[in-house]
Amino acid sequence: MSTHDILHRLSETLASRRHADPEKSYTAKLFSEGPDSILKKIGEECAELIMAAKDGKRLNIVWESTDVIYHVLVLLAFYGLSIEDVSQEMRRREGISGIDEKASRGTK
């Protein structure tokens, strides 16, 4: 199974949980609490990933990276986006210098 397959399947599963019972689904609970709750979890998981990386513990880095990716996918699904949207943007940027790509976006 490819990385794309597992992320695509997870993305679809998360979207399907949007209207599930928040008492029975952690994902549904996050959706029901809204973007602030999802963003808070992303921040917490990013901090845990940073600490795992600082400690150099490879297995913890994998675990925390998984948590970050999961919560980012929840955020995408909350806004009606998926890993496919991110993949399209990554394909668009492929082969472009990061400096050039950032400059092409202009000011926000």
Swiss-Prot record:
One of its GO terms (molecular function) is phosphoribosyl-ATP diphosphatase activity. It comes from the Bacteria. Gene3D superfamilies: MazG-like (1.10.287.1080). It catalyses: 1-(5-phospho-beta-D-ribosyl)-ATP + H2O = 1-(5-phospho-beta-D-ribosyl)-5'-AMP + diphosphate + H(+). SUPFAM superfamilies: all-alpha NTP pyrophosphatases (SSF101386). It is found in: Cytoplasm. GO terms for cellular component: cytoplasm. NCBIfam families: histidine_hisI, PRK00400.1-3, PRK00400.1-5. This is Phosphoribosyl-ATP pyrophosphatase.
